Swiss-Prot record:
Protein's name according to its UniProt entry: DNA ligase
Record-level GO BP terms: DNA repair; DNA replication
Entry keywords, A to Z: DNA damage, DNA repair, DNA replication, Ligase, Magnesium, Manganese, Metal-binding, NAD, Zinc
Function: DNA ligase that catalyzes the formation of phosphodiester linkages between 5'-phosphoryl and 3'-hydroxyl groups in double-stranded DNA using NAD as a coenzyme and as the energy source for the reaction. It is essential for DNA replication and repair of damaged DNA.
Reaction(s) the record says it catalyses: NAD(+) + (deoxyribonucleotide)n-3'-hydroxyl + 5'-phospho-(deoxyribonucleotide)m = (deoxyribonucleotide)n+m + AMP + beta-nicotinamide D-nucleotide
Amino acid sequence: MTDAAQRISELRNELDAHNYRYYVLDEPSVPDAEYDRLFRELQALEAEHPELVTPESPTQRVGGEALSAFGEVRHEVPMLSLGNAFEEDDLRAFDRSVQSGLGLAGGDLFGGGAEVEYSCEPKLDGLAVSLRYENGQLVRGATRGDGSTGEDISANVRTIRNVPLKLQGEGWPQVLEVRGEVFMPKAGFEELNARQAEAGGKTFANPRNAAAGSLRQLDPKITASRPLEFCCYGVGQVSGELPGTQVAMLQQLKAWGIPISRELKLAKGVEACLDYYRDIGQRRMSLAYDIDGVVFKVNNIEDQQQLGFRARTPHWAIAHKFPAQEELTELLDVEFQVGRTGAVTPVARLKPVKVAGVMVANATLHNMDEVARLGVMIGDTVIIRRAGDVIPQVMAVVPERRPADARPVHIPEQCPVCGSAVERTQLIKRSKGKASVSEGSVYRCVGRLSCQAQLKQAIIHFVSRRAMDIEGLGDKTIEQLVDEKLIGSPADLYKLTYEQIIGLEGFAEVSSNKLLAAIENSKRPSLARFIYALGIPDVGEETAKVLARSLASLERVRQALPEVLTYLPDIGLEVAHEIHSFFEDAHNQQVISALLGECGLELQDEGELSAEFSAVATLGGMLDKLNIPTVGPGAAQKLAERFGSLEGVLNGDWLDMRQALPERQAKAVREFFDETANAQRARAIEQQLREFGMHWESEKKVAEGLPLAGQTWVLTGTLEVMSRDVAKEKLESLGAKVAGSVSAKTHCVVAGPGAGSKLAKASELGVKVLDEAQFLEQLKSYGIEA
C-alpha cells in the first residue's frame, strides 16, 4: 500500500469514527473545525489520486449526476403501515388484543393478565425508507411507496450525513435491510426556509414536506444540500441472526453504526407505555424534530411472529397519535362536491388560517349528519383540526360567536355538477341478530357516469398507478376527454384514436403515440389490479388482493354471495354486500363485459380457488352467517350437530329442534325458515359453497392426494430463505394445518434461528423437528421449490 493509500484509509476510518460518535452516540469527539480539516485533507488526497476514490468514502456524499427518473424497487418484505390509537382506551384495547393473541390471561375486558414488554420510541414525522446493506456496504435506498413497491433513491440517501455508507464493527448479516424515517430537524428546516426565501425560491410549509421534497429530488446534489437525517426503527430482509428482542436488535444496529432514536425505552405493561406517551407529549415541543405520536411494539420478536399481521398492519405494533392541532376561524360558505360513488358531501370554505404550519382554507364536514350533529351554520366561528396533522376538519362550533345573519346549511336537491336528482339513502348496519341498526345516511347523485364529476373520478381511479397504471393519463387530460365527450366509461379509453388524442391540449405526435401504447400495455392486468380499478365502494387495494388471491377468478367474485364473501380475510358483511351489489348492477355488468370483450382486456392470474379456502365452511358457521334472530355461534353449532345437514335443519320436526335448542331459539329458527325467501337463501349459499369447493363436504375430496393432509405443523424462529407466511402457504397447499402452538398432536416443528419456547416444547413432547434446510428438502420432494 502506498503512503497516499495508507493515509486515505486512515482518514476515512477516522472520519467514519467521528461520524459515528457525532450522529449515533451523540458524543462529538473533536471540534467541527478539526473534522473539517480532516475532511479537506481527504478531499485533496482523493483529487490527487482519483483511482483511490471508493463509493463509501465520506467525500462521496455530495451527490452524483442527476437522474431522469427514479427506478422501481420491489420490497422483499412489505413495508407495512401501523394501526393507530387516538385515546388511552385504544391502547389498552390493543394491549388486551396482544395478550389474547399470545394466550396470556387478561385478554378479556376485565382480566388482569401478564404484563407484556413493549419497545417505545417517538413516531417521527418524515418519510419511511429502506436501506439495504450487503457485506456491510450500503447498496440501495428505497422509499416505502405502496408498501410492496417503492422508488430507488440510492443516490440521494448516500448524501445523508448520518447514514453509514459502510457498517461499523463486525458480525453483521450478509444482507441487512434496515427501515426508518428520513426527517428534517426543526433548526435545519428554519435555516433551509431562510435560504430559500433569500434566494427567491419556494419555502416549505413544514419539516415533513421539506424532507419529502428534498429526498425525492432527481438531482442528488440538491438532496446533499438539505439538512436531512435518518433514524432506524426496524429491519426488513435479513440473511443472518439478530437479537431476539426489538430493543436488543436496535441496540445491535446502533453498534454497527445505524442511528436509532435516543428516546428508545423498554416498558413493561400498558400503563408504563402510557407514562412514556405522556412524558414524550410534554416534551414534544422541545424535541429537535417533529413527531406526531409514539410507536409501541411487542418487544419479543418471536411473540411478534406469533401475533402476525392484518392486511396492511401488524398485530404487534401500534402508533399512539397525539391530538391534532386546532385553530379558530370563520366558516365563509359550504359547497358540495360529488365523489366517485356519487356521494354528495359538504366542504367548508374557511377564512384562511395557519394550522400546524399549513395555511388552511378548506375543511371536510364529512356528511350532512355531521353538519346536523355540529349544528353548524354559515357565518359561524368554528374550531378546525388537522386530523392526524394532515386532513383539516371542522370539529366544533363556538355558539356564542354566532352572528345574527348566520345561515343554515341545506343539501341541494339537484347535483351541483350535472343537475340530476340527489337522493338520500339510509345506511344500515346488518347487526348479528337480529335488528338492523341505522348508521346515518348518505346523499347521492343518481346521474352515475352521466355525471361528469363521477365519471372523471371513476376514470382517474381506473387509470391510477395502483389500478390499471396507464401512464400519461393525468387528471387534466381526463377532464379534457370527459368535457369533449370522448369517453363516457372506462371502456371508452380503449377506443380512443390517435386523431382524438392529438387534438387534446398538450399532446403532440410523440406523446399521443406514447399514450396509445400505455393504454395498449394495460390490457393484461392482474386480477387484483382489475378489481381495484373498478372502484367498488369500500374495496381498497388490499381487499382487491384478498378477493383475487382467495377466489382466483373474476367470475367467482362476480357470482359470490355476501355470506360466502365473508369467509375471506378482513371482509365483513357490509363490504360483502357492497361487492355483491356492485356486480349485480346492470350498468356495471355492461362496462365489465365491454372491457373483457370488445376492449380486449385479458386477466393474467386467474385459476383455481386458493387451497386455503377449500372446505373452509362448516354447517354451524354457515347457519351463524344467516343472522337468524337470537341464534349465535353456539346455538348454530348445536343445530349442526343435531341435524348434520342444512336440509335436516330445514325439514327437522319440532321435537328435534327443541332437543337442540331452548324453546325461544327453536321457535326463532322455525319462524325464520318458514319464510320461503330465507330457506331459498340458505340453499343458495350452500350450493355456492359446493360450487366454489368451500363446502364442508369438500374436505375429504380436498385431502385426497395431498401428502400432508391431517397433519399439524408449527413454524418458529426466523426463516431465512422464505418468510413464515410463505412457508405457511406452502404447507397448507400440501394439506397441512399450520398452528401457532405445539401440542402432543403436532406432527412436526420447523425451527429457524431464534426459536424459543416452541422448540423446547417440541423436544419435551418428542415432536419431530426440522431446520430450514431439511424443511426445504422436504418441500422439494413434493415438487415445491423455495
